[in-house]
From Swiss-Prot:
GO terms for molecular function: oxidoreductase activity, acting on NAD(P)H, quinone or similar compound as acceptor; quinone binding. The gene is ndhE. Belongs to the complex I subunit 4L family. This is NAD(P)H-quinone oxidoreductase subunit 4L, chloroplastic. GO terms for cellular component: chloroplast thylakoid membrane; NADH dehydrogenase complex. It catalyses: a plastoquinone + NADH + (n+1) H(+)(in) = a plastoquinol + NAD(+) + n H(+)(out); a plastoquinone + NADPH + (n+1) H(+)(in) = a plastoquinol + NADP(+) + n H(+)(out). The keyword Nucleotide-binding does not apply. The keyword Glycoprotein does not apply.
Length: 101
């Protein structure tokens, strides 16, 4: 019963993240939705690791690597966002075409 609830929560988080990533026009919102997607993947990794082999922590260790990757992605994304905001005075995705100066 708990397994199904966790998978339902993970699918729900993933769907919200995909919907937000597709429909968002703000870069900060897109980064937050990407973090939601990565967190739902982590939830799946830990759940399936516990379900199939509870003695080994392969899914948990891999989830820690994904969390570190998400932190690096957030730091790089926010620094790029800060640079674009400083130059363009906007954080909207459709106004940040850097190829047209």
């Amino acid at each position: 019963m708990m397994f199904e609830l966790v998978l339902f929560l993970s699918v729900y988080l993933f769907s919200i993240g995909i919907y937000g990533l597709i429909t968002s026009r703000n870069m900060v919102r897109a980064l937050i939705c990407l973090e939601l997607i990565l967190n739902s993947i982590n939830l799946n990794l830990v759940t399936f690791s516990d379900l199939f082999d509870s003695r080994q922590l392969k899914g948990d260790i891999f989830a820690i690597f994904v969390i570190a990757l998400a932190a690096a992605e957030a730091a790089i994304g926010l620094s790029i966002l800060s640079s674009i905001h400083r130059n363009r005075k906007s954080t909207r995705i459709n106004q940040s075409n850097l190829l047209n100066n």
